[in-house]
């Protein structure tokens, strides 16, 4: 989200509670920043790890959440090998995702779809609408097709500008993506991706 900080704790709690659709398994939060979402994930008594690239945020998290000490990963999520994170165990992906890389985060999710049965979090409203769009919709596109091939997408709720400091120029939205029953598309996945990108 850049330098727009979520200040409404009720919204943060609501976002954190979206992980409850996949109970018991570990949680990976991407881009925790100052921990506004993290503080509501920790009481769930699950194995919570956070990935943060910004040095100052990492230092703050270590100070504010000592119980997270060994579970703070200072790294670029887009370059990580997610297979090793929880010893090959499936996990929930969540976060107030940085809007400038949210699409890349979801492409990364698709690479590890067999490890990620559930992905929730907050993104730009326009992107959320695209991901959740049905065939024939004006917003139906590459993200819609690729994600919906493997996940059932639910647009949960809209988050308005005034709950951030400073308020961004765009609305946000919270979505939930649950892995569907598809295990094989019946064609080469790379070819499928290329065809979809060419089509749109």
Language-model segments: residues:
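Catalytic cores of RNA-modifying enzymes
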Residues: 1-198
């Amino acid at each position: 989200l850049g330098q727009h900080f979520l200040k409404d704790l009720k919204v943060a709690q609501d976002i954190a509670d979206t992980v409850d659709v996949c109970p018991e398994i570990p949680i990976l939060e991407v881009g925790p920043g100052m921990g506004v979402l993290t503080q509501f994930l920790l009481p769930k008594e699950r194995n919570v790890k956070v990935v943060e690239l910004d040095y100052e945020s990492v230092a703050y998290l270590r100070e504010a959440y000592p119980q997270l000490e060994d579970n703070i990963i200072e790294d670029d999520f887009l370059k990580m090998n997610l297979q090793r994170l929880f010893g090959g165990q499936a996990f929930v992906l969540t976060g107030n995702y940085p809007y400038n890389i949210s699409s890349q985060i979801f492409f990364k999710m698709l690479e590890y779809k067999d490890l990620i049965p559930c992905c929730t979090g907050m993104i730009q409203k326009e992107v959320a609408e695209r991901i959740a769009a049905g065939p024939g919709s004006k917003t139906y596109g590459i993200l819609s097709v690729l994600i919906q091939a493997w996940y059932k997408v639910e647009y949960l709720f809209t988050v308005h500008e005034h709950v951030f400091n400073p308020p961004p120029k765009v609305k946000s939205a919270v979505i939930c993506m649950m892995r569907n029953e598809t295990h094989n598309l019946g064609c080469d996945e790379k070819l499928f991706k290329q065809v979809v990108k060419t089509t749109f």
